[in-house]
Amino acid sequence: EKAGSYTLDGLILSNEDNGIIYHAIGVNGTKFSDYTKFPRFFDQLAAIDPDLIIISLGTNESFQTSYKEEHLKTDMDLFNRELLKRKITGNILLTSPPPSMKNRKNINELATAFSYEMGVFANLNSWAFYDLHSVSRTSSAMPDWYRAKLSSSDKVHFIEPGYRLQAQLLIEALFNSYDSYRE
């Protein structure tokens, strides 16, 4: 008998215990437009039926010279339409790209502009928004992060301590938001 072929995209192992079930997807260089090319991603997201979806994109788009704010708005809108089409009801938290540098010396102004546009988009679509530019207190924070040994020498990517700090700050923001909600 000939065996059929199949594709295994992922596997979820869980039990009946309370707690967080965490899923992650992403590849270095991924952009909003990469996800919208693959409807199956949204089908699988709907099957998981998450309570919270955290979207952290925008850095890669900000390094494309021909990619502007209008392109970002279009790509975010297409992404959102795919979510709506599948009636995905989980809360969405959009995070902005962090401050970064181009060629190790110039502020990535597009990342700053994208951060603003993402905040506007999140507000218009009732998504929560976490602005890494505001958390950093300035668009030129990357050299400080580098001097603090939190980012790599390219002044775009973080190293483990930097990612850990970002995670800690995000977790604190989530808990603070939840505490405010409970009050």
Predicted segment positions?
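Conserved SGNH/GDSL esterase-like catalytic core that processes O-acyl groups on lipids
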Residues: 1-74, 157
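Hydrophobic positions in alpha-helices of CheY-like receiver
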Residues: 79-83, 122
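Catalytic His-Asp segment of secreted/periplasmic serine-dependent ester chemistry enzymes
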Residues: 99-183
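Well-ordered alpha-helical segments embedded in enzymatic catalytic cores
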Residues: 40, 75-79, 169
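Charged helix-capping and loop-helix junction motifs
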Residues: 70-78, 110-114
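A generic secondary-structure signal
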Residues: 43-44, 82, 173
